[in-house]
Curated annotation (Swiss-Prot):
The gene is mmm1. This is Maintenance of mitochondrial morphology protein 1. It comes from Aspergillus terreus (strain NIH 2624 / FGSC A1156). Residues 128-379 form the SMP-LTD domain. Residues 271-282 have a biased composition (Pro residues). The chain crosses the membrane at residues 21-41. The lineage of its organism: Eukaryota, Fungi, Dikarya, Ascomycota, Pezizomycotina. The SMP-LTD domain is a barrel-like domain that can bind various types of glycerophospholipids in its interior and mediate their transfer between two adjacent bilayers.
């Protein structure tokens, strides 16, 4: 009995080992088969598309209440005739606030949260900062064009940068009486370009706009440049009589390095203008009163009424603006060299350098350092024929332009042939004698007009009822001038 009990465990041990071995082999076979089926013979996933369809499938936009109401309004507009005062559909504030803009542009910005003291904190976006390499190239091209234009206009008496700086430095309303006329002796616009980097979008609280406003912050750095200006003047001692003593002074100011954080934001047209405190209020003059009353008088100006009738926007219409400024933690390093006196000259006086640097910093902070901002109006980007230009050169003739021009010439040619077949009231072709068709004398006199001494410059002319030749080009079937004017 004891022998049987001792013989059972080896049999059960062998049976469990066999089952485990078979189970392990089966699992290995299944893994190998799954690997061969799904990883070797499986179809590769399609490459990610960069088109708009993939972007639309990745970022699902939920249908808002405004979309539903817009569709309903569109269906109602087919049945009901809208009034003339309700043609432009209103834009809800929910589609123009900060959160809606960030959601529709897929920019992950963190909204502002109230702090313990009741103020709103400014949170940076979770979006990665941008390098702005493309922006640096555009800014560099713009600055290079300004430098080249300033050099080309150096000899102009009114448009040169020298005359502008001289007039600004010698402004009688700002220049003290103890300083003589300031003469600009040297101007250097530099050779390097500012480098912008680390651009990020933040949401700040603004009581004038719904949901706050967006602000772009970017770091700017300008170093190792020779941006400088040199001036000469004289200090006048007007006691006991004017011009009792004269002390010549020569200064040279150079920008060694500038770095800071630039803030750019958009000011909508409906927002009231930003109030920028000035250190000294401007005096009320008769010219200023006349300037303030000028817009009222312009309302009765016939030129302005004709401009409004032609479709151009009025000059008094509100415009969107761009506000930019620098944070107070900027860095502006200057190099000031001075030369005082005529005989025994004092060179590079430290006190003069401190005074000049303090004045330059004060001038800069009074204009573009927070909380003061510079507001610049955005230009009118509506396409107009008055601003239309054509690139010169043979390489600018692209295939699309050539195709469009050939299509236009083909249409004109077909219309000319139709008009010539209709009768003598169509367009006349002026060409050399060898190009004349064999017409009779009547048709020849009405269709061809050859001038002695050379042919007319315009390829097409029109002969009126009196037999005179006019250079005006009129398309067949067009309205007369009187009908167009009415």
């Amino acid at each position: 009995m004891n022998f049987q009990q001792s013989a059972i465990p080896p049999f059960s041990f062998l049976l469990s080992f066999t089952q485990g071995f078979l189970l392990g082999q089966l699992s290995v076979v299944l893994l190998i088969g799954a690997f061969i089926k799904f990883f070797i013979f499986g179809e590769a996933p399609p490459p990610p598309s960069r088109g708009l369809s993939h972007r639309a499938s990745t970022h699902r936009r939920s249908n808002s209440i405004y979309t539903i109401s817009t569709n309903e309004a569109g269906s109602r507009s087919l049945r009901e005739k809208p009034s003339t005062s309700n043609v432009l559909r209103p834009v809800p504030s929910s589609s123009t606030n900060t959160r809606s803009i960030l959601r529709k542009t897929y920019y992950g910005a963190i909204p502002t949260n109230p702090s313990k003291h009741g103020r709103h904190r400014v949170h940076h976006s979770s979006h990665q900062p941008e390098s702005l390499d493309w922006f640096n190239v555009l800014i560099a091209q713009t600055i290079a064009q300004y430098r080249q234009t300033a050099y080309l206009l150096k000899d102009e008496p009114t448009s040169s940068i020298l005359s502008s700086l001289t007039a600004a430095l010698n402004n009688p309303e700002k220049k003290p009486s103890f300083i003589d006329k300031i003469t600009v002796t040297d101007i250097s616009l530099g050779e390097e370009f500012p480098i912008f980097s680390n651009c990020r979008i933040i949401a700040v609280d603004d009581p004038n706009s719904d949901g706050g406003r967006l602000q772009a912050l970017m770091d700017v750095d300008l170093s190792d440049d020779n941006l400088s200006i040199g001036i000469e003047t004289s200090l006048l001692l007007n006691y006991p009589k004017p011009g009792s003593a004269i002390l010549p002074v020569a200064l040279s100011i150079s920008v060694v390095r500038f770095s800071g954080t630039l803030c750019i934001s958009l000011v909508p047209a409906s927002t009231p203008p930003l109030h920028t405190p000035s250190p000294s209020p401007a005096p009320q003059t008769a010219d200023g009163a006349r300037t303030q009353s000028q817009p009222e008088n312009n309302s009765s100006n016939p030129n302005q009424q004709s401009a409004d009738a032609s479709g151009a926007p009025p000059k008094t219409s509100p415009k969107s603006n761009v506000a930019f400024s620098f944070l107070p933690d900027y860095r502006l390093d200057l190099s000031v060299r001075s030369l005082i006196g005529s005989r025994s000259r004092l060179q590079d006086v430290p006190k003069v350098a401190q005074l000049v640097e303090a004045r330059v910093h004060a001038w800069f902070e009074e204009r573009v350092v927070e909380p003061r901002v510079q507001v610049v109006g955005l230009p009118d980007l509506w396409p107009r024929m008055g601003r239309t230009g054509v690139r010169t050169g043979e390489d600018s003739e692209t295939g699309s332009n050539a195709a469009s021009r050939s299509a236009i010439s083909a249409d004109l040619g077909s219309s000319l042939r139709d008009d010539l077949d209709q009768g003598p009231d169509g367009l006349r072709f002026r060409g050399p004698l060898g190009a004349r068709p064999q017409f009779d004398s009547v048709s020849r006199s009405s269709s061809f007009n050859v001038e002695t001494g050379g042919f007319h410059g315009h390829p097409m002319t029109r002969e009126d009822s009196r037999g005179a030749i006019s250079d005006d080009f009129h398309m067949p079937g067009s309205l007369p001038d009187g009908a167009v004017g009415n």
